[in-house]
């Protein structure tokens, strides 16, 4: 480990979540000498999310049985009045995984193409001389100074690394979704391959989820700016009449909590010799709070651009901005549209949520916001005040 931390690297990636591991993987396969640093003593812990991941083929990741717990075909949206909307396409939409194993799988995949990995290593400072960064690392009480031509910050919602580099990424409290979740056994699912989502006063400005996970299920929720704690809402939901007793015999085997930055992406994700990816960059769905897909994709882009920059011997912001251009071209409009839709949905009363559900077909292949908004206003004109900028 000492030799690892005493070396100099082309690229240092900080944070071994999905975004960081994908960035280091693509940096390494593009020829850059890469170090992946994580503060945890075990990659993949603690788990802080509902563990749903997208269809993985586009990332070249084999859906290994070691981490796949359930295949997901779609979702069931449940309105406050109990009406269910089934959203189901024609193929597998993704998976619920064991994140502890999934994250390790991604890190091992990166190591197999040359990435070096340092665990139990906390970054406590950054120094920049105009050409390279010196990353100051505390590993088991020992301080190391490691040089890198490029630093990629993938250190999650609580990111401090980007701030050290002068990039503003601190999130407002009102932009952080507080999440609490039980993994439970003996849950009676509506469908073993469908995710369930519940809306209304049971979870203000958020939603409750039940995700099938093999022999267990993840039951959790995310709330924003609430007077009560997420865990209090979750415990109340476990006895909610909408569940019709489906959790009466369920019991928790694990508790997880965390936060998701749902206020949209940060304004700037690059600087000279520096990039930001994943939750640290706000690359997360403002509506669902899901960020694994975006982290995998944006991490891949960052790693590729880092490798190209090293080959070109140009690590300036003018070169690295290609990362920002590529990810924004793919996702920026989508994220900003979702932010707009989220602000609309958060204003809905339970009565209005029921009216919206009544305006939707009971079976959908996908969510078309404009079409749903048009039908909702047609059936319930009072909703026009919310949807006038959408239809």
Swiss-Prot record:
Binds 1 FAD per subunit. GO terms for molecular function: FAD binding; geranylgeranyl reductase activity; oxidoreductase activity, acting on the CH-CH group of donors, NAD or NADP as acceptor. The lineage of its organism: Archaea, Methanobacteriati, Methanobacteriota, Methanomada group, Methanococci. InterPro entries: DGGGPL_reductase, FAD-bd, FAD/NAD-bd_sf, Geranylgeranyl_Rdtase_fam, Geranylgeranyl_reductase, GGR_cat. FAD binds at residues 19, 38, 49-50, 52, 99, 123, 279, 291-292. GO terms for biological process: glycerophospholipid biosynthetic process; membrane lipid biosynthetic process. Is involved in the reduction of 2,3-digeranylgeranylglycerophospholipids (unsaturated archaeols) into 2,3-diphytanylglycerophospholipids (saturated archaeols) in the biosynthesis of archaeal membrane lipids. Catalyzes the formation of archaetidic acid (2,3-di-O-phytanyl-sn-glyceryl phosphate) from 2,3-di-O-geranylgeranylglyceryl phosphate (DGGGP) via the hydrogenation of each double bond of the isoprenoid chains. The keyword Flavoprotein applies. It is an enzyme of class 1 (oxidoreductase). This is Digeranylgeranylglycerophospholipid reductase. It catalyses: a 2,3-bis-O-phytanyl-sn-glycerol 1-phospholipid + 8 A = a 2,3-bis-O-(geranylgeranyl)-sn-glycerol 1-phospholipid + 8 AH2; 2,3-bis-O-(phytanyl)-sn-glycerol 1-phosphate + 8 A = 2,3-bis-O-(geranylgeranyl)-sn-glycerol 1-phosphate + 8 AH2; CDP-2,3-bis-O-(geranylgeranyl)-sn-glycerol + 8 AH2 = CDP-2,3-bis-O-(phytanyl)-sn-glycerol + 8 A; archaetidylserine + 8 AH2 = 2,3-bis-O-phytanyl-sn-glycero-3-phospho-L-serine + 8 A. It comes from the Archaea. One of its GO terms (cellular component) is membrane. Pathway: Membrane lipid metabolism; glycerophospholipid metabolism. A 2,3-bis-O-(geranylgeranyl)-sn-glycerol 1-phospholipid binds at residue 369. Keywords: FAD, Flavoprotein, Lipid biosynthesis, Lipid metabolism, Oxidoreductase, Phospholipid biosynthesis, Phospholipid metabolism. HAMAP family: DGGGPL_reductase. Its EC number is 1.3.-.-. SUPFAM superfamilies: FAD/NAD(P)-binding domain (SSF51905). Reduction reaction proceeds via syn addition of hydrogen for double bonds. Belongs to the geranylgeranyl reductase family. DGGGPL reductase subfamily. Its cofactor is FAD.
């Amino acid at each position: 480990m000492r030799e690892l931390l005493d070396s100099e690297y082309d690229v240092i990636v900080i944070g071994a979540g999905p975004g960081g591991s994908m960035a280091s993987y693509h940096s390494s396969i593009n020829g850059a000498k890469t170090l992946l640093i994580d503060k945890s003593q075990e990659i993949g812990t603690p788990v802080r999310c509902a563990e749903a991941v997208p269809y993985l083929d586009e990332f070249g990741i084999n859906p290994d049985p070691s981490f796949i717990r359930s295949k997901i075909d779609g979702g069931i949206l449940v309105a406050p009045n109990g009406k269910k909307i089934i959203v189901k396409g024609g193929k597998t939409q993704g998976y619920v995984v064991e994140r502890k194993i999934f994250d390790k799988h991604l890190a091992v995949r990166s190591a197999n193409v040359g990435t070096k990995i340092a665990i139990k290593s906390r970054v406590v400072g950054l120094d920049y001389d105009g050409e390279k960064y010196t990353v100051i690392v505390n590993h088991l009480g020992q301080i190391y100074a490691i040089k890198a031509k490029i630093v990629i910050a993938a250190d999650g919602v609580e990111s401090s690394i980007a701030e050290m580099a002068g990039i503003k990424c601190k999130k407002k409290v009102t932009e952080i979704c507080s999440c609490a979740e039980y993994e439970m056994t003996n849950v009676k699912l509506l469908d073993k391959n469908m995710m369930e989502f519940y809306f209304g006063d049971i979870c203000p400005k958020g939603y409750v989820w039940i995700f099938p996970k093999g022999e267990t299920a993840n039951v959790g929720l995310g709330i924003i700016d609430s007077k009560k704690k997420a865990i209090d809402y979750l415990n109340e939901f476990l006895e909610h009449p909408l569940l019709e007793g489906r959790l009466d015999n369920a019991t928790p085997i694990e508790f997880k909590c965390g936060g998701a930055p749902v206020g949209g992406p940060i304004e700037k994700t690059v600087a000279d010799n520096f990039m930001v990816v994943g939750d640290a960059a706000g690359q997360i769905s403002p509506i669902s709070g899901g960020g694994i897909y975006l982290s995998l994709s944006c991490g891949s882009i960052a790693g590729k651009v880092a490798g190209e920059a090293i080959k070109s011997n140009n690590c300036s912001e003018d070169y690295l901005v290609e990362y920002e251009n590529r990810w924004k071209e793919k996702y920026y409009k989508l994220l900003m549209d979702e932010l707009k839709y989220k602000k609309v949905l958060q204003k809905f009363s339970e009565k209005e949520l029921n009216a919206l559900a009544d305006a939707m077909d009971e079976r959908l292949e996908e969510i078309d916001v404009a079409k749903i908004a048009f039908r909702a206003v047609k059936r319930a004109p009072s909703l026009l005040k919310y949807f006038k900028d959408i239809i």
